Amino acid sequence: MSVCRQLLVRHRGLDPTAWTALHALARLCGDDPPAALARAALWEFTWEGDADARLRSWVAGANWFANPNRDRATWRQSAGDATDLEAGAALAGGGVGSAGPGAYLVTAWRGADDAPEHESAACRVLGRPVRLRRGQVWWLAAAAGDAGRILAPGGAAARLLANPHSESARRVVGALPVPLLGDEPEGADGGAPGGERR
């Protein structure tokens, strides 16, 4: 049976990149500004069989995915699992930590979402084939209204948070699915810049 686990890695404190992007978006979005923005590295591990405990133990000690002095790592195995992104979100009014609904923008370098060195190491440690993919997740909450609308494909927020020339981007409204990174061909729904998943 195929198993997929997501690892989301975010800053424990204020993420300066998210804070800067949040204030840039406040200028771009005019009357509908975001209230909070968070960013996390996304890693997806896929394998066959029972290796979950060994994988988590290796990742915690490897220091390749998260720096324990700076980062918070959250494991997910289904869409119902928390992402913990809102707890680390930069707030427009200053500070960190948000609550309530939001929307996600998931980005990945087109043609380069694999992580071959990390994947080879995971295969050696687990003693089985492992598929490893990487991307980035942004979580945005609106000051008022619909966060998903702020992240609309082709909108100012999507263009600021993802480079349309080199990254695929998809908006996710609702729960973040597991798995999320896939083999969509260029131009498929959810695989091209500005794609969407609900």
Locate predicted features.
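Core nucleic-acid recognition elements
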Residues: 1-198
